[in-house]
UniProtKB/Swiss-Prot annotation:
Designated name of the protein: Glucose-6-phosphate isomerase
Species: Mesoplasma florum (strain ATCC 33453 / NBRC 100688 / NCTC 11704 / L1)
Keywords on record: Cytoplasm, Gluconeogenesis, Glycolysis, Isomerase
GO MF annotation terms: carbohydrate derivative binding; glucose-6-phosphate isomerase activity; monosaccharide binding
Pathway: Carbohydrate biosynthesis; gluconeogenesis; Carbohydrate degradation; glycolysis; D-glyceraldehyde 3-phosphate and glycerone phosphate from D-glucose: step 2/4
Enzyme Commission no: 5.3.1.9
Gene that produces this protein: pgi
Enzyme class: isomerase
BP GO annotations: gluconeogenesis; glucose 6-phosphate metabolic process; glycolytic process
Length: 426
C-alpha cells in the first residue's frame, strides 16, 4: 500500500548499506537495541486488549449520541496522530455528526478563550489524554474546559461526557478521573507518545468521531504482514536507508511534501515522529513539510534555486482521490483555462506532481524520494502509521541513536518551570 520510488533520489541500491540494514533489523526483532523497552507498538495491531477495545466502542457510542462536539485535550503524540487520522480519513470540511476540535496543544490565552466562547451552548464532551496528568498545556486547558462543562450541564451529567486516557494505575489524571467517576482507558507503558496513535490515545477519539477503527487496525496489520523482510525488499527499510544515505551525503533537512490538504496533519505527525526520534547527539535530519501546490507559491522559489545540498524532498503521491471533479468549459474563457476543460482536478494535480518533480530534480538538483499511496482512507492510514513507525526505528538505529527517548525536551521545561515558580524547581 506504500511503494518507495528512488528513481529521482540520485541513489542506487548500492548506496543504501543493506548489510547494516540487516543488522539493525535483527536488533529490532530481538529487541536488543537502545530503548527496547518502548517497542510495544511492534506487535500492538495484533495483540492489543480486545476487551478494552470493545469497552471503548460502548463508551464512545454512548458519548457520540450525547454530543455534537468532542474536545480532545492533549499535546504532541496525544494530539497530532488524532488530528492526522481524522483529517485524512474524514476530510477537513466534512458534515459528519460529531466535530472534533483540539485543546491542550497550546498555551495561547486567545485560543483557549475563543474555544470557550465557541463551546457556549453547544453539546460537547471532553477526551483528556495524558500519561501523567501533569503536562502543563493539557493540564491547564482541561481545568478550564472541565469547569465550563460542569457549569453547563452539572456535575452528574458531566460524568458521562468526560473520558480520560491515561496510565493504568497511577498519576494525577488517573487519580482525578477515578475520584470524579470519569471512565478511563490505558496508555501502554511500553509505547511512547509519538508511537501511540493506534492505542486508546488515538482510537477512542476516532471512535467518537465515527471513524471505522477496525479498518485502521486492518491497515496496520497488513503493514505488519508485508513489512517483515530484513532487507531492502522491505519498503519501509528502503525509505529509511535512502534518507540515511542522503544524510550521510551531507543533506541536513527532509521535507515531506503532500499534494492533498487533508494530509497536512499527517505531515505534522510525521515531523514529531522523526524529529523526536532522531534529533539527538547532534545528529539527525531536520524534518519539515510542505503542502503543494499551495507552498509552491511561497517556498517554491527557494526549493528551485535556494541553497543546494541542504534539503531533499519526500513526496507523497496519492493514486486515487476520495472525490473528484471535472473542470468545466466557460463560454467567455476570460482566464484562458478552457484547455483544461474536461480534465479532472485529480488529473491536473497528478500532472503537477510530475512537472514539479522534474523541475526540482533535473533543473534544481534537489533529490526526491517518492512514496506512492493507494488512496486516503482508514485502511491506508493504519498502514502508513505502521510504515513510518518501523521506518523511524530503522532510521534511528542506522543513525546510532536511541529512537525512543527525547531527553532534550526537558531543558526548556526546566527553564519554564523555574520562571513560573513551580515548587521544587530551583
Amino acid at each position: 500500500m506504500i511503494k518507495v520510488d528512488l528513481q529521482h533520489s540520485g541513489l542506487s541500491i548500492a548506496d543504501l548499506n543493506e548489510a547494516k540494514v540487516k543488522k539493525v533489523h535483527e536488533m529490532i526483532i530481538n529487541k536488543s537495541g537502545k530503548g527496547n523497552d518502548f517497542l510495544g507498538w511492534i506487535e500492538w495491531p495484533k495483540t492489543f486488549d480486545k476487551k478494552e477495545y470493545e469497552e471503548m466502542k460502548k463508551v464512545a457510542s454512548s458519548l457520540r449520541n450525547k454530543i455534537d462536539v468532542l474536545v480532545t485535550v492533549g499535546i504532541g503524540g496525544s494530539y497530532l496522530g488524532i488530528r492526522a487520522a481524522d483529517e485524512m480519513i474524514r476530510g477537513i470540511n466534512h458534515s459528519d455528526k460529531v466535530q472534533v476540535i483540539y485543546a491542550g496543544h497550546t498555551m495561547s490565552s486567545t485560543y483557549v478563550a475563543q474555544l470557550s466562547e465557541y463551546l457556549k451552548g453547544k453539546k460537547f464532551g471532553i477526551c483528556v489524554i495524558s500519561k501523567s496528568g501533569t503536562t502543563t498545556e493539557p493540564g491547564i486547558a482541561f481545568r478550564a474546559l472541565e469547569k465550563q462543562l460542569i457549569e453547563q450541564v452539572g456535575v452528574e451529567a458531566s460524568k458521562e461526557l468526560i473520558v480520560a486516557v491515561t496510565d493504568s494505575s497511577k498519576g494525577a489524571l488517573k487519580t482525578l478521573a477515578d475520584n470524579k467517576g470519569y471512565p478511563t482507558f490505558v496508555i501502554p507503558d511500553d509505547i511512547g507518545g509519538r508511537f501511540s496513535v493506534l492505542t486508546p490515545v488515538g482510537i477512542f477519539p476516532l471512535l467518537v468521531a465515527g471513524v471505522n477503527t477496525d479498518n485502521i487496525f486492518a491497515g496496520a496489520i497488513k503493514a505488519m504482514d508485508e513489512l517483515v523482510q530484513g532487507d531492502l525488499t522491505n519498503e519501509a527499510y528502503k525509505y529509511a536507508a535512502a534518507r540515511n544515505a542522503l544524510y550521510n551525503a551531507g543533506y541536513k533537512a527532509e521535507a515531506l511534501v503532500a499534494y492533498e490538504l487533508q494530509m497536512q496533519y499527517t505531515a505534522e505527525w510525521w515531523k514529531q515522529l522523526f524529529g523526536e526520534s532522531e534529533g539527538k547527539d547532534n545528529k539527525g535530519l531536520y524534518p519539515t513539510s510542505m503542502i503543494f501546490s499551495t507552498d509552491l507559491h511561497s517556498l517554491g522559489q527557494w526549493v528551485q534555486e535556494g541553497a543546494r545540498n541542504v534539503l531533499f524532498e519526500t513526496v507523497i503521491k496519492v493514486k486515487e482521490p476520495v472525490a473528484n471533479m471535472l473542470v468545466e468549459a466557460d463560454t467567455d474563457n476570460y482566464d484562458g483555462l478552457n484547455y483544461l476543460s474536461g480534465k479532472s482536478f485529480h488529473e491536473i494535480n497528478s500532472t503537477a506532481i510530475e512537472g514539479v518533480i522534474d523541475a526540482h530534480v533535473n533543473t534544481g538538483k534537489m533529490p526526491n524520494i517518492v512514496l506512492e499511496f493507494d488512496k486516503m482512507n482508514d485502511v491506508q492510514f493504519g498502514y502508513l502509521v505502521y510504515f513510518f513507525e518501523i521506518a523511524v526505528a530503522m532510521s534511528g538505529y542506522l543513525l546510532e541513536v536511541n529512537p525512543f527517548d527525547q531527553p532534550g525536551v526537558e531543558v526548556y521545561k526546566y527553564n519554564m518551570f523555574k520562571l513560573l515558580g513551580k515548587p521544587g524547581v530551583k
